[in-house]
């Protein structure tokens, strides 16, 4: 079963886990409207995250525009412009192969790297199928926000299975 980041965050939120605020947009106009809703709560800095079933979205490239799959926007106008460069495009990451995956949805989220009054931390949590044993494996790490493959290679002790 594959779920998008926004769906996983909704599940965690339903269990009382405090998560980054965000909304799902399917058009650049919706992205701008939703970012305005977020900016009333915190700041104008917004993170736009392509929603595809693959990792490496931040370093991935949209074939048609050259944009990354995860970008920071500093204003509402920038949200709309950057959304145009992502939505409808084909995102190629190290996990998608050259064919990439079409981006139909965008997570419009608050920037958690702000210098605000609340402390913010990122973690990694994944449930994977170990194909060799046919068993689900839960992986967790304090090194959230980065490619977990890189953490596994450089600091395997930071991953709990």
Where are the regions a protein language model picked out?
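Gly-rich Lys/Arg/Thr-decorated short loops/hinges at beta-loop-alpha junctions or inter-strand turns
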Residues: 11-17, 61-64, 157-159
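Glycine-rich phosphate-binding loop of ATP-grasp-fold ATP-dependent ligases
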Residues: 20-22, 48-82, 124
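Hydrophobic alpha-helical hairpins/lids featuring a short glycine-rich hinge
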Residues: 80, 92-161
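ATP-grasp fold ATP-binding core
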Residues: 5-12, 41-61, 93-116, 125
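A conserved helix-loop-beta module that forms one wall/lid of the active-site cleft
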Residues: 1-37, 44
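Duplex nucleic acid-engaging cores and interfaces of nucleic-acid transaction enzymes
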Residues: 75, 87, 108
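Generic, ordered loop/turn and secondary-structure boundary motif
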Residues: 4, 12, 26, 53, ...
């Amino acid at each position: 079963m594959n779920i998008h980041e926004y769906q996983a965050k909704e599940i965690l939120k339903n269990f009382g886990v405090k998560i980054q605020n965000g909304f799902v947009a399917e058009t650049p106009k919706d992205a701008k409207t939703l970012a305005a809703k977020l900016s009333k709560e915190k700041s104008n800095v917004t993170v736009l995250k392509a929603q595809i079933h693959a990792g490496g979205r931040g370093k991935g490239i949209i074939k048609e525009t050259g944009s990354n799959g995860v970008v920071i926007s500093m204003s509402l106008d920038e949200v709309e412009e950057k959304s145009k460069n992502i939505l409808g495009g084909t995102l190629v990451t190290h996990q998608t192969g050259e064919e990439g995956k079409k981006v139909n949805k965008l997570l419009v989220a608050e920037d958690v790297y702000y210098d605000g009054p609340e402390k913010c931390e990122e973690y990694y949590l994944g449930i994977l199928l170990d194909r060799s044993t046919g068993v689900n494996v839960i992986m967790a790490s304090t090194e959230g926000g980065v490619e977990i493959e890189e953490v596994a290679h450089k600091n395997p002790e930071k991953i709990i299975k």
